[in-house]
Swiss-Prot record:
The keyword ATP-binding applies. Its EC number is 2.7.1.39. It comes from Corynebacterium jeikeium (strain K411). Keywords: Amino-acid biosynthesis, ATP-binding, Cytoplasm, Kinase, Nucleotide-binding, Threonine biosynthesis, Transferase. GO terms for biological process: threonine biosynthetic process. This is Homoserine kinase. The lineage of its organism: Bacteria, Bacillati, Actinomycetota, Actinomycetes, Mycobacteriales.
Length: 308
């Protein structure tokens, strides 16, 4: 059994939302967004206390099943430390089940809090590994851990037994690029949306997406003029349009007007990456149809402050 962390030590975490895929980079590209959840984890004498306000309040479990708690416990175990008890408080602004990385943010917050309580013994890639384990892919978690843009990948062991190895590397984002999120007033299940995807795609479509993913990395870092071309996709958005017709309508409409729009993660949120704001008339129309429209900057990495 490892060292026990003293009662009273507290980790306060600010974790960003994220968007994944960015059009062609399915389960590969991610981007941290300036919308945040805040988590405080304090060591107490015994037991577990969980409090949630904001997004998810009254909907998520307030016990060991809570994702922040699960990720925090996993991190403490990896760091070989223990706690007599925990008080976890979450103040959430990231909409849940909307394609903005709420679950990855929760996992990242738990990992960051655990790492802070343990004395910052784990490096960034170790934190990406633990957080991604709860996701099954590292694009969102990588973005929340590292900030800015990320290229991510997964190495799946051939023995079929060992755990996958998740990796992410940061891409600095051109300072002129901003995000506009069009957030519909309904949820989407990532698992359900993934089920509509075919098991195979054509070589032509695969080649198309490989090239546009490469273009997108250049667009993000150096050349925002390439954002429209870099967000083109033939791998997943067409299939998901069948179950997200409102989202598909807005993606197509925005793109036809020249905006680099795409499905954010599994949706239903639509994201535009550009150097210019979206026309106010479109924004007001979207709001009139029940959408929340947020102008977001590109975020830095998860932040942790430890006291006690």
């Amino acid at each position: 059994m490892g060292v026990e962390i003293p009662v009273g030590r507290k980790a306060t975490v600010k974790v960003p939302a994220s968007t994944a895929n960015l059009g062609p980079g399915f389960d590969t590209l991610g981007l941290a967004l300036g919308l945040y959840d805040y988590v405080t984890a304090e060591v107490i004498e015994s037991g577990l206390e969980v409090e949630v306000t904001g997004e998810g309040e009254g909907e998520v479990p307030l016990d060991e099943r809570h994702l922040v708690v699960r990720a925090l416990r996993a991190t403490l175990k990896e760091a070989d430390v223990t706690v007599p008890g925990l008080r976890v408080s979450c103040t959430n602004s990231i909409p849940q089940s909307r394609g903005l990385g709420s679950s990855a943010a929760a996992a990242t917050a738990g990992v960051a809090a655990g790492n802070g309580l343990a004395g910052f013994t784990l490096d960034d890639q170790a934190q990406v590994q633990i957080a991604s384990t709860f996701e099954g892919h590292p694009d969102n978690a990588g973005a929340s851990v590292l900030g800015a843009g990320v290229v991510s990948w997964t190495n799946t062991p051939i023995d079929g037994v060992s755990a996958p190895a998740y990796h992410a590397r940061r891409i600095d984002v051109h300072p002129d690029i901003k995000a506009t999120a069009f957030i519909p007033d309904f949820h989407a299940s990532t698992e359900a949306i993934r089920r509509v995807l075919p098991s195979d795609i054509s070589h032509v479509d695969a080649r198309f997406n490989v090239s546009r993913t490469a273009v997108m990395t250049v667009a993000l870092r150096d050349d925002p003029d390439l954002l429209w071309e870099g967000t083109r996709d033939r791998m997943h958005q067409t299939y998901r349009a069948e179950v997200l017709p409102v989202t598909a309508e807005w993606v197509n409409r925005l793109r036809n007007l020249g905006y680099p729009a795409f499905l954010s993660g599994a949706g239903p949120t639509i994201l535009v990456l550009s150097t210019e704001p979206v026309d106010n008339a479109l924004v007001e129309e979207a709001r009139g149809r029940g959408m929340k429209v947020l102008e977001l900057g590109i975020a830095g990495p998860v932040e942790v402050d430890v006291t006690g």
